[in-house]
A protein has these predicted regions:
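Glycine- and acidic-rich phosphate- and metal-coordinating loops
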Residues: 119-125, 143-144, 148-167
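DPxDG-like acidic metal-binding loop motif
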Residues: 73-76, 172-192, 405-408
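Phosphate-handling active-site elements
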Residues: 149-158, 186-202, 409-423, 427-431
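Beta-strand segments within the central parallel beta-sheet cores of soluble alpha/beta enzyme folds
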Residues: 93, 155-163, 194-205, 356-358, ...
Length: 453
């Protein structure tokens, strides 16, 4: 994979001065204390995996079709404190879920697909983390992935995992952050040297192989490859990626009129997808069916049915053969892929307002063409577009639960937060009342990639 390791602060027009603000020393010390008590080891022996959540400004729903995507880590996520267990035992506790998880890394693990009644998926195609006191399956999935790649594990871990309060099931890829945290901890405990690109595939083994889901590699890539202050671009067909920063920062020049933007997250209060939605896997199947028809029509029936394998010219020539739903899915893919490429240019040149307009268009296409989004999320998206200082918004995830993201002028951030909070209360009073008003709308910063402290 192509990789440009630009790891510099404030490399874009977001407020990104200094180092990431998360995790704090207090958070780290608290987790070290808990793991020390669990393991009867010194706090100095405790290691902590920092695995951030992510946002994807452009590239909605096209990673599984091999499209281009963009992403960045944020300063919220999962912290996993651990020590090597000294034997093959894994002992885990969670701040969010009840009950200890205990198993052995030398157990032979087999796929735990969602046909199992204890499993379920959310609208993003990820497994639900909390059902039936089965929250430890991502840890088992990490062992499964390492076993499948023929790594011999002799060390388990004693660990304590905590996600940022209120952000699980929020459309920020908490499940991918959890899976990667376990992978990094187990690899560290067993002295395994695994590259980020390998771990992208390992985490996909957790979700695709162990849990039987059909999601792509966007979330894992964003968490593992992001760099503080930069925008990650990934081609999901070739797996090539690069980190992008505006040209004016390359030359250490900044226009006096250049606005600074922050990331705004607005939560819907929906923790579970509505039962009437068609589901992530169904949308993936529709995209593949559209690709199959277009490839057959263009004489390429032997090619794997993904929309990335359909040339733009072939799509334009044969799209009339697609029935209405499939035509909409294909239109979303090709228009979104174009928006990503245009967005990369806007970002690189520091045109954040143009970048924001493309994000808003992405959100609209997700609703109209990809036909995803529960009513509360659609309302939240529309409120954000009216909020002071917001230059672009869309769902963070599939739009059936969780939150919406937006880029907001830093000078208007506080005003935008208050506007969104009040307007959402008007249209969804019951959902709004269920949330803590202090965390229902958040201002975030960029974060760094997953790493171990």
């Amino acid at each position: 994979m192509a990789y440009t390791p630009n790891r510099v602060g404030n490399c874009l027009a977001l407020q990104s001065m200094g180092n990431p603000s998360w995790p704090s020393e207090d958070e780290l010390n608290e987790i070290k204390t808990i793991v020390s008590e669990m393991s009867k080891r010194s706090k100095e022996d405790v290691r902590i995996v920092v695995s951030p959540y992510r946002i994807c400004p452009l590239g909605a729903h096209i990673d599984h079709q091999g499209g281009n995507v963009s992403a960045m880590a944020i300063n919220k996520g999962v912290l996993l404190g651990f020590v090597p267990s000294g034997d093959v035992q894994v002992i885990l506790r969670s701040a969010q879920f009840k009950g200890d998880v205990n198993f052995r890394v030398d157990e032979k693990l087999y796929p735990n697909h969602c046909s199992n009644k204890k499993e379920g998926t959310n609208a993003n195609g990820h497994a639900k983390l909390q059902e039936d006191n089965n929250w430890g399956r991502y840890a088992r999935g990490a062992v499964y992935a390492l076993q499948k790649k023929e790594h011999c594990l002799s060390q388990g871990i004693i660990g304590y995992i905590r996600g940022s309060d209120g952000l699980d099931s929020s459309g920020l890829s908490s499940s991918a952050a959890v899976g990667l945290a376990y992978l990094l901890a187990l690899e560290n405990a067993n002295n395994l040297t695994i590259s980020p690109t390998e771990n992208i595939e390992y985490d996909r083994l957790i979700e695709n192989g162990y849990l039987g889901l059909k999601n792509g590699i966007l979330d894992q890539s964003a968490i593992l490859l992001s760099s503080y202050g930069c925008l990650l671009h990934m081609n999901c067909k070739t797996k090539d990626f690069k980190l992008i920063r505006p040209l004016y920062m390359e030359s250490s020049l900044k226009s006096e009129t250049q606005k600074e933007y922050q990331i705004l997250l607005a939560f819907s209060g929906l923790k579970q997808a509505l039962t009437s939605n068609p589901g992530y896997n169904h949308r993936v199947a529709e995209c593949q069916e559209a690709a199959k028809i277009l490839l057959n029509a263009s004489g390429n029936s032997h090619v794997e049915p993904h929309l990335c394998n359909v040339e733009q010219e072939a799509y334009e020539a044969h799209k009339s053969q697609l029935e209405t739903n499939l035509a909409k899915r294909a239109e979303h893919y090709f228009s979104e892929n174009t928006r990503v490429l245009q967005g990369l240019e806007a970002w690189a040149s520091g045109r954040l307002e143009d970048f924001g307009k493309l994000i808003a268009a992405s959100g609209r296409s997700s609703i109209v063409n990809y036909e995803c989004g529960a009513e509360p999320l659609i309302q939240l998206y529309e409120i954000l577009l009216r909020a002071p200082g917001v230059c672009g918004a869309r769902f963070s995830g599939a739009g059936f639960r969780g939150c919406c993201l937006a880029f907001v002028d830093a000078n208007y951030a506080a005003e935008a937060v208050e506007f969104v909070r009040k307007e959402y209360m008007k249209v969804q009073p019951e959902l709004a009342a269920q949330m803590n008003p202090e965390t229902a709308v958040l201002i975030c910063e960029q974060g760094d990639c997953a790493h171990i402290i």
